[in-house]
């Protein structure tokens, strides 16, 4: 397909999990989500290596991009009627996943991969129902940054560098089977700077990625 078209790929994966209620107040759980394996994506491009005789010639690029495996565990506590507190942790295995494992350039000048490292993610949150009619919610999530300074250039299209996330929400039960929820999601700004591996640029040339986000969910 051309650069303005879309491409699809078949993929599959699986998930295993278990939950155990220790007592009426505390429950624990754990899960494993396998990598989500996809066929390679393909698109039309041109040879980007100026040192090769076929520089600029049309080529078909293939890129394997899977979703990493995730190990997770969590705990939930209900200390008061209507109040639920929860905490969980996750470990994402980017370093063994196609598309994220490799880094740098291929011989034809295409990017070999994003070069992400494995990360831990922790999250805490709470929900409180008022008279079983109205709910208020809050949560916080911290994620390690999978992108090192050396790989910033290769991740300009996908700057997943944010680390601190805050969520607020509310809900109301309108009827027995009808509920309306509103949520606010804020990602605190984070920036990272790294070198540009291009010999045509002056020594010490750098690129900076910066990202933040605000979302409202209904």
Question: Positions of the model-derived regions?
Answer:
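Outer-membrane beta-barrel porins/channels
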Residues: 1-218
């Amino acid at each position: 397909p051309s650069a303005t078209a879309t491409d699809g790929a078949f993929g599959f994966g699986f998930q295993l999990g278990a939950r155990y209620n220790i007592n009426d107040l505390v429950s624990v759980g754990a899960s494993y989500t396998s990598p989500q394996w996809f066929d390679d994506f393909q698109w039309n491009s041109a040879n980007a290596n100026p040192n090769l005789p076929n520089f600029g010639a049309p080529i078909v690029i293939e890129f394997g991009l899977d979703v990493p495996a995730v190990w997770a565990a969590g705990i939930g506590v209900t200390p008061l009627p209507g109040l639920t507190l929860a905490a969980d942790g996750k470990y994402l295995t980017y370093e063994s996943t196609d598309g994220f494992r490799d880094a740098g350039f291929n011989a034809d000048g295409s990017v070999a991969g994003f070069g992400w490292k494995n990360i831990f993610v922790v999250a805490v949150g709470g929900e409180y129902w008022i008279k079983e009619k109205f709910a208020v919610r809050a949560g916080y999530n911290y994620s390690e940054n999978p992108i090192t300074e050396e790989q910033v250039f290769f991740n300009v299209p996908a700057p997943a560098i944010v680390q601190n996330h805050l969520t607020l929400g509310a809900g109301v039960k309108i009827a027995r089977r009808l509920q309306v929820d509103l949520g606010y999601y804020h990602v605190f700004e984070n920036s990272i700077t790294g070198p540009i591996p291009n010999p045509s640029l002056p020594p010490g040339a750098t690129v900076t990625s910066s990202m933040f986000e605000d979302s409202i969910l209904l």
